[in-house]
């Protein structure tokens, strides 16, 4: 067989990524050889494949759910925003330039349709089933002409479409109906039904509404997934991380030692790969929060400056907010600070940037003996090394080239006192290294904190992916879902007026 399915959504963050991952995990547990696919992703959270290609981190997570190695075929187009109006375009894993939204939708996007269809065809020729994820909503009528990720690809590849709606936000029935009613007759023929996500309460109270929706649209609901905490793994962007103060705390479990460890993550502009701190949040006794005010660093045992798509912009933001001076005071007092990728670069002496911000010479915070020069060629690699006596694996995604002139070696970067810096994303996912690093932080902070010996980040990730598979298996109509994947959308689905505007 060469089955396929497109998971569309009524909105962004409706749950498309986790539903796609859940279906992949459910299928692979049934012995189906399955792969994920997203034609075009807009995200600052990315991943480096074994062949050195950059793809959306959500697709890497979905590949893990499918128990296959992620490749550039699974996300041929990645857009990495640099501002509200422009993005870096990554094609088949390599950056090909910056482009404005108007320029992209004005012609470039449409020209990429052949590329993404070729990638999808290659995957469908290799796997039993390909589960595709859409983007935003398929009913963005102003963008339909150049769409290559929702109905544009569904029409060309004849994929059945399942629309996911987040009922926790309210208005899910109007969203379901409106999504279908704004599609053309040809697009509507592929929309097979709906999947309710994040439901709280008694499903029997929802069922009359689902029956009414079926009567109105001629399309069934394929399941009601209950709301579950802790399943927003590898989010595509910072949608859930407001930049207004301490707004996102990890759910801390009981510490092994006497004290908890508090981690403050600076919520810098254009945060990228902030999933780096997920491994810290997974440790019992470690609480992680995102902050944007200097006073919020006062009780933090560790401050993390994460990656960013705008290093110079992040420096300006840190200075404007008074965080730069707070970081200098921390460093002088021997209190731990960790910079990762762009966060590492801001800790250096100066930056020469004629590529990203085109600001030329910019002074850094001066906390590490590092000089950074931005190169047009992006570094995309998966390094392996050792630090603090432990094996470490990571991945690098950056234009900045660091010249380290002093300090103690730390991965590819350095350490001076209690200030660490590295380009390596994902290093904290190495369990032994993470525990050794947290012991160093606890000692410097004077905390009686003991890392849990048995915490496996990879194991916890597998448990989360299994929970996603369980959600599909237990709360979706899997027989109907399998028929949809295998045979496509049923014929004779009714047209819901008014349809797409002329």
Swiss-Prot record:
Asked whether the keyword Cell cycle is assigned, the reply is no
HAMAP family (alphabetical): CobQ
Organism whose genome encodes this protein: Streptomyces avermitilis (strain ATCC 31267 / DSM 46492 / JCM 5070 / NBRC 14893 / NCIMB 12804 / NRRL 8165 / MA-4680)
Q: Which residues does the UniProt record annotate as the domain GATase cobBQ-type?
A: 260-433
Q: Which domain of life is it from?
A: Bacteria
Alphabetically list the UniProt keywords: Cobalamin biosynthesis, Glutamine amidotransferase
Return the NCBIfam families for the record: cobQ (TIGR00313), PRK00784.1 (NF001989)
Q: Which InterPro entries match?
A: Class_I_gatase-like (IPR029062), CobQ/CobB/MinD/ParA_Nub-bd_dom (IPR002586), CobQ_GATase1 (IPR033949), CobQ_N (IPR047045), CobQ_synth (IPR004459), GATase_3 (IPR011698), P-loop_NTPase (IPR027417)
Q: Which GO terms describe its biological process?
A: cobalamin biosynthetic process
Family according to the record: Belongs to the CobB/CobQ family. CobQ subfamily.
Q: Name one GO molecular function term.
A: ABC-type vitamin B12 transporter activity
In the UniProt record, does the keyword tRNA processing occur?
A: no
Q: Could you tell me which pathway this protein works in?
A: Cofactor biosynthesis; adenosylcobalamin biosynthesis
- Functional summary from the UniProt entry: Catalyzes amidations at positions B, D, E, and G on adenosylcobyrinic A,C-diamide. NH(2) groups are provided by glutamine, and one molecule of ATP is hydrogenolyzed for each amidation.
The name under which this protein is listed is Cobyric acid synthase
Task: Give me the gene this protein comes from.
Answer: cobQ
The residues responsible for catalysis, as annotated, are 341 (nucleophile), 425
């Amino acid at each position: 067989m060469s089955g396929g399915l497109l998971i569309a959504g009524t909105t962004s963050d409706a749950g498309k990524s986790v539903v796609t991952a859940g279906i992949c995990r459910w299928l692979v547990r049934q012995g189906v050889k399955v792969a994920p696919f997203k034609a075009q992703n807009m995200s600052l959270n990315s991943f480096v494949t074994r062949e050195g290609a950059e793809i959306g981190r959500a697709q890497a997570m979905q590949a893990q759910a499918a128990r296959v190695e992620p490749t550039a075929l699974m996300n041929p187009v990645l857009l990495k925003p640099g501002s509200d109006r422009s993005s870096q375009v990554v094609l088949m894993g390599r950056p090909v330039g910056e482009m404005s939204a108007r320029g992209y939708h004005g012609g470039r996007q449409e020209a990429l349709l052949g590329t993404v269809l070729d990638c999808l065809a290659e995957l469908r020729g290799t796997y039993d089933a390909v589960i595709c994820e859409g983007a935003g909503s398929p009913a963005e009528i102003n963008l339909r002409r150049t769409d290559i990720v929702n109905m544009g690809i569904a029409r060309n590849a004849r994929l059945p479409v399942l629309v996911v709606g987040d009922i926790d936000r309210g208005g899910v029935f109007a969203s379901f109906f409106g999504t279908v009613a704004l599609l053309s007759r040809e697009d509507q023929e592929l929309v097979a039904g709906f999947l309710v996500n994040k439901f709280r309460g008694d499903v029997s109270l929802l069922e009359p509404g689902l029956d009414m929706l079926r009567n109105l649209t001629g399309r069934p609901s394929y399941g009601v997934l209950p709301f579950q905490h802790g399943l927003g793994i590898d989010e595509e962007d910072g949608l859930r991380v407001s930049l207004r103060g301490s707004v996102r705390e990890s759910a801390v479990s009981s510490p092994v030692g006497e004290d908890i460890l508090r981690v403050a993550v600076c919520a810098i502009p254009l945060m990228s790969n902030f999933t780096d701190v997920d491994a810290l949040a997974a440790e019992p006794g470690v609480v992680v929060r995102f902050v944007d005010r200097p006073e919020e660093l006062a009780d933090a045992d560790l401050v993390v400056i994460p990656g960013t798509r705008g290093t110079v912009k992040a420096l300006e933001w840190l200075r404007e907010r008074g965080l730069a001076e707070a970081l200098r005071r921390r460093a002088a007092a021997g209190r731990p600070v960790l910079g990762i990728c762009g966060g590492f670069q801001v800790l250096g002496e100066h930056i020469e940037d004629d590529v990203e911000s085109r600001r030329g010479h910019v002074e850094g915070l001066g906390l590490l003996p590092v000089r950074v020069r931005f190169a047009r060629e992006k570094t995309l690699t998966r390094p392996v090394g050792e630090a603090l006596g432990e094996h470490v694996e990571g991945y690098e995604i950056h234009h900045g080239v660091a010249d380290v002139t002093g300090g103690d070696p730390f991965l590819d970067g350095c350490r001076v006192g209690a200030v660490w810096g590295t380009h390596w994303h994902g290093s904290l996912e190495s369990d032994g290294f993470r525990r050794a690093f947290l012991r160093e932080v606890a000692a410097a902070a004077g905390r009686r904190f003991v890392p849990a010996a048995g915490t496996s980040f990879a194991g916890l990730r597998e448990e989360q992916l299994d929970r996603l598979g369980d959600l599909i298996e237990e709360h979706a109509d899997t027989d109907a879902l399998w028929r949809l994947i295998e045979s496509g959308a049923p014929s004779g689905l009714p047209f819901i007026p008014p349809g797409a505007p002329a």
